[in-house]
């Protein structure tokens, strides 16, 4: 069976600062949207947002949720993968990746929607969920090319290619949550594959480590205000030689830094 503690608290480390703060912020924004109905309109990404130069929505749309269940499901789904990513890449680095992944997925959504003459708007962090789950599955596939379904469903002996697990998750989500945005989820998944397989390309878009370290130095007074029990992962604390560690129990480490570096550390 999957080990939730591996994802929620990798190697026993405390909850990550950005992940924890993001969950609080998502809840806060949802609360405001319940008080002011028009508030959510400033976040919802429509197919015309890109072409109307309404660029703020390209990065803001994952922050707004349209219902309580929408918020709860996305919060539960994002906390594990994002906490895992942040603890192995650094807090500021993860913030940059969150923004970049939202923008790239948003552009994909707007362009494809325009080509298909779609007019439906999207909002919510589910695109991020697919991005980070896909990234983890790509890395997991380097340890185990096939995923045994018995880890999730006792008695089932079938297996599927690990790197294609997000596709199965995408189809499952489309069936169970039939009102969700299939295109939005697909765009998020595509970004996850880009991150997993195209790290060299993605590195170009991420500030080098020395810039992130400078930002951390300037933000040090604020970092020190983070409550006890929640950790801000500094770039200098990230060991790029550790490689990827499986979130399944009792599995060994496979270095993922040969050749090159951990995503965004070049």
UniProtKB/Swiss-Prot annotation:
Membrane-crossing segments per the record: 16-36, 60-80, 92-112, 118-138, 164-184, 192-212
Cross-referenced Gene3D superfamilies: Rhomboid-like (1.20.1540.10)
Molecular-function GO term, any one: serine-type endopeptidase activity
GO CC terms: Golgi membrane; nuclear periphery
Subcellular location: Golgi apparatus membrane; Golgi apparatus, cis-Golgi network membrane
Top EC class of this enzyme: hydrolase
Main location: Golgi
The enzyme's E.C. designation: 3.4.21.105
Catalysed reactions, as listed in the record: Cleaves type-1 transmembrane domains using a catalytic dyad composed of serine and histidine that are contributed by different transmembrane domains
Keywords linked to the UniProt accession: Golgi apparatus, Hydrolase, Membrane, Protease, Serine protease, Transmembrane, Transmembrane helix
Database matches in Pfam families: Rhomboid (PF01694)
InterPro entries: Peptidase_S54_rhomboid_dom (IPR022764), Rhomboid-like_sf (IPR035952)
Membrane topology: Multi-pass membrane protein
Any single GO BP term: proteolysis
Top-level taxonomic group: Eukaryota
Active site per the UniProt annotation: 126, 185
Sequence similarity: Belongs to the peptidase S54 family.
Protein task: Probable rhomboid-type serine protease that catalyzes intramembrane proteolysis.
PANTHER family assigned to the protein according to its UniProt record, in alphabetical order: RHOMBOID PROTEIN 2 (PTHR43066:SF1), RHOMBOID-RELATED PROTEIN (PTHR43066)
Protein name: Rhomboid-type serine protease 2
Organism the protein comes from: Candida glabrata (strain ATCC 2001 / BCRC 20586 / JCM 3761 / NBRC 0622 / NRRL Y-65 / CBS 138) (Yeast)
